[in-house]
Amino acid sequence: MDSIVQWYQQGPARYISKQVFVMLVSMLPLIELRGGIVVARLLKLSLGQALIFSLIGNIIPIPFILLFINRIFDWLRPTKHLGGLVRKMEARAMSKSESVSRAEFWGLVGFVGIPLPGTGGWTGALIASLLKIDVKKASAAILLGIAIAATIMSLISYGVFHM
């Protein structure tokens, strides 16, 4: 995360506020809120600002993934150049879906809420879409999971559990 912060300070800091940068980092797949909170801490933002902007950034992509990813994948799957990537993404997401498929709501909460590599809102929304979990149920589970991940990452980055 240090390299992301250094890159930001050497260029985009002139045009993008720290808060917006944290929000943008939190929107990225794989990095998400987990990275956004760490970046906020490195940029010396308050815990309140870190939470607000990383939560907003992590939540923004979720409805789009839940509502449109299956259609986008259906459209891209037959293409020569992107079909393989789509199949690879689907296979990777489904390989992590066992706990979610067994206990839909709580499985999704746990999957999104435990900040481990390859988990989070993006992958959780992708799995929920591929398993055809009801959008309202998936949204609630993912939001709860994101809140849990935010709590854990805040404790690690700002407080009790320093790593």
Segments from the language model and where they lie:
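Broad hydrophobic/π-residue packing in well-ordered secondary structure
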Residues: 42, 82-83, 129, 149
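Hydrophobic alpha-helical transmembrane segments and immediately flanking/interface helices
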Residues: 119-143
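Helix-capping/transition residues at the boundaries of transmembrane alpha-helices
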Residues: 40, 128-130, 161
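Transmembrane helix boundary and interhelical junction motifs in multipass membrane proteins
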Residues: 27-39, 64, 116-126
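Membrane-interfacial helix-loop-helix
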Residues: 1-23, 45-113, 133-137, 143, ...
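Hydrophobic transmembrane alpha-helices of multi-pass small-molecule transporters
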Residues: 33, 62, 150-154
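Short hydrophobic alpha-helical segments that form membrane-spanning helices or hydrophobic packing faces
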Residues: 39-40, 141
